[in-house]
Swiss-Prot record:
GO molecular function, one term: glutamate-5-semialdehyde dehydrogenase activity
Protein name: Gamma-glutamyl phosphate reductase
NCBIfam families the record matches: PRK00197.1, proA
Cellular component, GO, one term: cytoplasm
Major place of residence: cytoplasm
Top EC group: oxidoreductase
Stored Gene3D superfamilies: Aldehyde Dehydrogenase, Chain A, domain 1, Aldehyde Dehydrogenase, Chain A, domain 2
Length: 423
C-alpha cells in the first residue's frame, strides 16, 4: 500500500464530504446518530467478539493492565456508547446559530455565526469507544473526520466503522464523512498530521509518547492534553465523610484514566484525622502509597503500611496504576502553590466546607477543570452533559477541558446590510 497516496485520497474525500456535512440538516444528522445507536444494540455480540480477539492479541503482546482496561469493550461501555449517541442527538444543533447581533452606527448589523471546523483528524490508541464518541460529535457538529485508532483495536474499530457508514447512508449523508484509517502503519499518522490542505485540526487521544511525537511533528493545529496529573486537596475545614468518598473515588474508581487522582494533598491541621482511614482504605485496595515525611509519620503511627518514600519525580508522575503520592501541606496557599507547580492543568479538586476557600481554589488553580467537594473522575464530557467528548484539552486556546460539540466549531463574523458603503 502506498501510504502517502492512501492518506491523500482519504483527505480529499473528507474535504469533499465536509462541504456536504456543513449544510446537512439537523434531522439528517440525528437520523444518522439514531441508526448507529440501533446498529450497536443489534450487533452488540459481534462487536464484543471482535473486541475479545483484539484483547487476546494485546495480552499476547504483553500489554499492561491499564492498557487492557482501556481496550476492553464491556457491556457497560457498549451501553454508554449508545447513550452517548442518543444524548448527542438530543443536543441542540449549534451550526448556523447567530449570536451577538448588533447594529453599528453605519447601519449594518454585525454578529457571529457558529460553523464547523471542517475536517478533523482523530488519532487514538486502544479505546474503541473513542471511535463512536468522535464520530458522533464530529457528525452532529457538521464536520467530517478521519479516525486513526490503535492497531490493537483494529478489528473492533473496523466493525464500528461499518455501522457508522451504514448509519450515514441511511440518513442520506456521505459515508466519507467518517473514515477509519484501515492500516496500522505508523506512516499513516505522519502523513495525517501534515495534510494541512485537507485537515483543519488534529485531536490526539493516547499516551504521552504519542502526544510528544505529534507535538514535535504536526503541522496541523491540535486540541490535546499531555498528562493527567490530577490532585485532590483535603482542607483542614473539610467534612471527613466527604473527604473519604471523594478521595476513594478519585483514585480507585478507575486507575487507567487521565482524570484519576495521582497526588493527594492534605492540610497539616487535619492530617491526623483523615490520613489513617484513607491509608487503610487504600491499603485494603492494594494501592501503593508514596509519601512525604509528614504523611509517613501519621500513617505509620496508625499502623498503615507498607509505605514508600516519595521523591521529587513522584509529584510529576501520571501513574495510571494503583499508586498514589501523598503530601502533607501547611495550608491552602501551599496546596495551590504545589498544584500550580506540578499539575498538568487537567483537573484538580478541593474538599472543604469553607466557601471563601473553595472560591479561591476555583479562581487560583490554573487547570481546565477545577472542582469543590467532587471527585476528579467527573471531568468527563458525558458527566458534564456534553453527550460525549472528543477529548480533554489542557491548552488555553480554542477549547479547554472536555471538548464537546462547541469545541468542534468556530465563529465567523456575519454582516447584514441594506446597501451601505463605508464612509
Amino acid at each position: 500500500m502506498d501510504i502517502d497516496q492512501y492518506m491523500t485520497d482519504l483527505g480529499r474525500r473528507a474535504r469533499q464530504a465536509s462541504r456536504a456535512m456543513a449544510r446537512a440538516s439537523t434531522a439528517a444528522k440525528n437520523a444518522a446518530l439514531a441508526a448507529v445507536a440501533q446498529g450497536i444494540e443489534r450487533d452488540a455480540a459481534l462487536l464484543k467478539e471482535a473486541n475479545a480477539r483484539d484483547v487476546a492479541r494485546a495480552r499476547e503482546k504483553g500489554h499492561d493492565a491499564a492498557f487492557i482496561d482501556r481496550l476492553t469493550l464491556s457491556d457497560k461501555a457498549l451501553k454508554t456508547m449508545v447513550e452517548g449517541l442518543r444524548q448527542v442527538a438530543a443536543l441542540a444543533d449549534p451550526i448556523g446559530e447567530i449570536s451577538n447581533l448588533k447594529y453599528r452606527p453605519s447601519g449594518i448589523q454585525v454578529g457571529q455565526m457558529r460553523v464547523p471546523l471542517g475536517v478533523i483528524g482523530i488519532i487514538y490508541e486502544s479505546r474503541p469507544n473513542v471511535t463512536i464518541d468522535a464520530a458522533a460529535l464530529c457528525l452532529k457538529s457538521g464536520n467530517a473526520t478521519i479516525l486513526r485508532g490503535g492497531s490493537e483495536a483494529l478489528e473492533c474499530n473496523a466493525a464500528l466503522a461499518k455501522l457508522i457508514g451504514e448509519g450515514l447512508e441511511k440518513a442520506g449523508l456521505p459515508q466519507e464523512a467518517v473514515q477509519v484509517v484501515a492500516t496500522s502503519d505508523r506512516a499513516a499518522v505522519g502523513k495525517l498530521i501534515t495534510m494541512t490542505e485537507y485537515v483543519d485540526v488534529i485531536v490526539p487521544r493516547g499516551g504521552k509518547s504519542l502526544i510528544e511525537r505529534l507535538m514535535n511533528e504536526a503541522r496541523v493545529p491540535m486540541i490535546k492534553h499531555l498528562d493527567g496529573i490530577c490532585h485532590v486537596y483535603v482542607d483542614d475545614r473539610a467534612d471527613l465523610a466527604k473527604a473519604l468518598t471523594v478521595c476513594d473515588n478519585a483514585k480507585t474508581h478507575r486507575y487507567g484514566t487521565c482524570n484519576t487522582m495521582e497526588t493527594l494533598l492534605v492540610a497539616r491541621g487535619i492530617a491526623a484525622e483523615v490520613l489513617p482511614p484513607l491509608g487503610k482504605l487504600y491499603r485494603d485496595k492494594q494501592v501503593e502509597l508514596r509519601v512525604d515525611a509528614a504523611a509517613r509519620a501519621v500513617l505509620a503511627d496508625a499502623g498503615v503500611g507498607p509505605l514508600v518514600d516519595a521523591t521529587e519525580e513522584d509529584w510529576r508522575t501520571e501513574y495510571l496504576a494503583p499508586v498514589l503520592a501523598i503530601k502533607v501541606v501547611e495550608n491552602l496557599d501551599a496546596a495551590i502553590d504545589h498544584i500550580n507547580t506540578y499539575s498538568s492543568q487537567h483537573t484538580d479538586a478541593i474538599v472543604t466546607e469553607d466557601h471563601d476557600r473553595a472560591m479561591r481554589f476555583l479562581r487560583e488553580v490554573d487547570s481546565a477543570s477545577v472542582m469543590v467537594n467532587a471527585s476528579t473522575r467527573f471531568a468527563d464530557g458525558f458527566e458534564f452533559g456534553l453527550g460525549a467528548e472528543i477529548g480533554i484539552s489542557n491548552d488555553k486556546l480554542h477549547a479547554r477541558g472536555p471538548v464537546g460539540l462547541e469545541g468542534l466549531t468556530s465563529l465567523k463574523y456575519v454582516v447584514l446590510g441594506h446597501g451601505e458603503g463605508r464612509q
